[in-house]
């Protein structure tokens, strides 16, 4: 097995993305939640993210981007690397309206998971209410992040209806 920390080149990723069954690039992005910058771990993440964007653009396979505790760097890199040329989805989105606006301006869709149904997820509630319906997606992120009323259980695709209901409630839809 390959070491997870082995650097993949754009050429290697492009070759993998060229497979006809591959329809998107990712999940990629930045997650600073658990990472300290020991051994330049953040630099490593940023470099890999840039590599993934380059490969996505070369193969015309949209990006599936995850970001956690890294919104400024994520948007900066998306802009610098011209991710708007390929577009994609901001997966399991938990950031604020400002970041959603920036991602929408770059042509990305915003996807919400079961977190949007959590009472304490006020920032996610505000963001879901803001995102236009034609740019909003729902997901399970299964087996994690089961929505209320299944919070704490293993998530499954059937629960996505609770994500949809939570968003409909936030948008005042009946």
Predicted regions and their residues:
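Mid-domain alpha/beta scaffold segments of enzyme catalytic cores
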Residues: 1-174
